């Protein structure tokens, strides 16, 4: 089972959309968090350690993640989607972008069954 963590700034729009969108993907568990201290679910060391794959929305998220959680980052793959903070929660355009960009990093559906 691959633990996939989706990260944005506030954990209000992009990362929870991704978490919900891929929650039923075979072979993975999903979670989401935000890097800002006032995020809905603030990112903590436990979530970073839990994750096998960390998917960030912007390059600044990757840099913050690497600085703040240096001790917890070991073998995790960190992927940046380059999706700006221009979308609402479950925005159809955001969903389309996520469907285009994320599956290449997830276990193949056929292999997971």
Protein language model features and the residues they cover:
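Short polar/charged helix/loop
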Residues: 1-113
């Amino acid at each position: 089972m691959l633990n996939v963590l989706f990260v944005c700034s506030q954990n209000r729009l992009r990362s929870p959309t991704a978490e919900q969108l891929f929650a039923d993907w075979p072979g993975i568990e999903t979670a989401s968090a935000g890097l800002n201290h006032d995020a809905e679910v603030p990112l903590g060391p436990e979530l970073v350690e839990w994750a096998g794959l960390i998917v960030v929305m912007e390059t600044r998220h990757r840099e913050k993640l690497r600085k703040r959680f240096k001790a917890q980052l070991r073998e995790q793959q960190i992927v940046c989607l380059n999706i700006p903070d221009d979308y609402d929660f479950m925005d159809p355009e955001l969903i389309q972008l996520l469907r285009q960009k994320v599956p290449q990093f997830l276990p193949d559906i056929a292999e997971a069954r």
